[in-house]
């Protein structure tokens, strides 16, 4: 576990000379080997913790960029070692950022209040008017979702399952979000109440609100240009690209959604591929594929 210390007066003066400001310099803590060399035009407020900035990132085309903080505003943020945070239009608030994160040209990233990050959101699957809602969570399986949606003649079972899910969601709720190690977020818009796992790559997303991106090193998640997601959970190894719009959806592992696909109140399980069309209140089973334009699926189970 890292140990932190307060800034020295010399370090505070160096930061001021680089056009950095703070509401209270005493609220900023740094690791022992911290240096101010790569921090410019940055504003700090609340409790801020900073790691070291020693390594470089190699970008596409051979461009090299040194880790550091450039033209950013941080509020109640912990920054890991060797991160590059640059050109944040508004601010980053209430986040713990892992090592080697690369965040550039982003509008805003924040957690506002206590969030469950998509856990516990009820998805009105199979009946768009409600009655068979499935509360989604990080560990949702097709089997569990099937029972929750179709075994409504077993009300005690459904009630107990929902209690377990609610308990899990509450245990994972926090007023601080996490951005994992080796995460890339570039050219993105509005990111609010989103938990982002290791090695996730977000490029040009329009809006991500109230959700979890359960990425990891072995199966990273990619979120592409123009994507808009509200009240969602996306599992490891999935790709959501090209203007896809999701509202109250669960995306299981290794799914691919793209080409302006639109879905609401739907569940997509392992290895689904959805492109071009629309979905409302569907239960998409394993290995389901649709890539035709004007395909509209409503209120059904599709395998």
Please report, for each region that a protein language model flagged, where it lies by residue.
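Domain-scale signature associated with acetyltransferase and cell-envelope carbohydrate enzymes
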Residues: 1-303
């Amino acid at each position: 576990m890292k140990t932190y210390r307060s800034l020295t007066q010399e370090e505070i003066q160096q930061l001021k000379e680089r056009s950095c400001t703070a509401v209270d310099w005493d609220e900023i803590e740094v690791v022992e080997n911290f240096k101010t060399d790569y921090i410019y035009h940055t504003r700090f407020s609340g409790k801020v913790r900073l790691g070291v900035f020693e390594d470089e990132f190699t970008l596409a085309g051979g461009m090299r960029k040194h880790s550091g903080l450039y033209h950013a505003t941080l509020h109640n943020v912990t920054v890991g070692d060797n991160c590059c945070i640059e050109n944040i239009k508004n601010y980053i608030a209430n986040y713990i950022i892992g090592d080697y994160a690369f965040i550039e040209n982003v509008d805003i990233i924040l957690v506002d209040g206590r969030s469950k990050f998509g856990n516990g959101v009820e998805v009105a699957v199979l009946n768009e008017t409600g009655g068979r809602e499935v509360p989604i969570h990080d560990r949702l399986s097709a089997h569990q979702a099937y029972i929750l949606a179709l075994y409504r003649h077993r009300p005690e079972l459904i009630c107990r399952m929902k209690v377990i899910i609610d308990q899990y969601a509450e245990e994972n709720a926090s007023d601080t979000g996490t951005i994992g190690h080796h995460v890339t977020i570039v050219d993105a818009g509005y990111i609010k109440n989103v938990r982002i796992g290791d090695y996730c790559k977000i490029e040009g997303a329009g809006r991500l609100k109230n959700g979890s991106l359960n990425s990891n090193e072995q199966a990273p998640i990619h979120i592409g240009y123009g994507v808009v997601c509200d009240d969602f959970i996306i599992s490891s190894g999935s790709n959501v690209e090209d203007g896809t719009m999701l509202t109250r959806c669960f995306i299981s592992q290794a799914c691919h959604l793209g080409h302006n696909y639109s879905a609401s109140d739907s569940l997509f399980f392992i290895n689904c591929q959805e492109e071009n069309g629309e979905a409302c209140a569907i239960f998409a089973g394993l290995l389901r594929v649709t890539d035709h334009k004007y395909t509209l699926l409503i209120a059904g189970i599709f395998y």
